[in-house]
Design a protein with these regions (language model features):
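Residue-level preference for short coil/turn positions at secondary-structure junctions
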Residues: 1, 26-27, 45
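Single conserved hydrophobic/aromatic residue that forms the stacking wall/gate
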Residues: 1-9
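Generic hydrophobic/packing signal
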Residues: 5, 14, 29, 66-68
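Active-site neighborhood of phospho(di)ester-bond hydrolases with catalytic His/Asp-centered motifs
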Residues: 30-37, 49-53
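Residue-level recognition of beta-strand microenvironments
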Residues: 39-41
């Protein structure tokens, strides 16, 4: 029986490919990763980097959840990328009812926008806020006015 090696990590396939040293030194043939919130598959012919996507807050997939099923034919693993619609309005309602909206209104507004549109992840918005603040303060101390301005400029209501 020939044994295949797999590796699961929390990182992005884009970052892995840009890190040629990592890919060159990695002995595993299959690298399964996440964290980018987007499904994807890349291969250099020898190694395969597979991103399952995101169940909770996927990017580029509005009002849908993503997952992946790996199947083997005994020689190779093949990813099947799946996406299912779910009741985003109920999720947003539950965020409001949980009290999270009161505790972290900007995070909630960004999340609501992302769930509805599949666009503008939290990191992108945070970078915009920090740029408006001229990188003077750590993110948790940035004044609300910068958050409001950033969300307004990005079209997040």
């Amino acid at each position: 029986v020939r044994r295949q090696r797999q590796m699961c990590i929390r990182d992005s396939q884009k970052a892995l490919l840009s890190e040629e040293l990592f890919v060159q030194k990695c002995e595993e043939r299959y690298i399964i990763c996440g964290h980018t919130h987007m499904q994807g598959f890349v291969s250099d012919g020898k190694k395969r980097i597979i991103n399952a996507g995101a169940v909770g807050v996927p990017l580029k997939s509005p009002k849908k959840t993503q997952y992946m099923i790996l199947t083997s034919d005994g020689k190779d693993w093949k990813p099947e990328f799946l996406s299912l619609e779910y009741d985003v309005d109920t999720v947003i309602k539950e965020i409001h009812e949980s009290g999270l909206w009161d505790a972290s209104p900007y995070w909630c507004r960004i999340t609501e926008h992302l769930l509805d549109t599949g666009e503008l992840p939290h990191g992108t918005v945070l970078n915009h806020v920090m740029k408006l603040n001229d990188y003077q303060d750590p993110w948790y101390n940035i004044a609300d006015s910068y958050w409001e301005k950033a969300l307004d400029e990005l079209g997040i209501r």
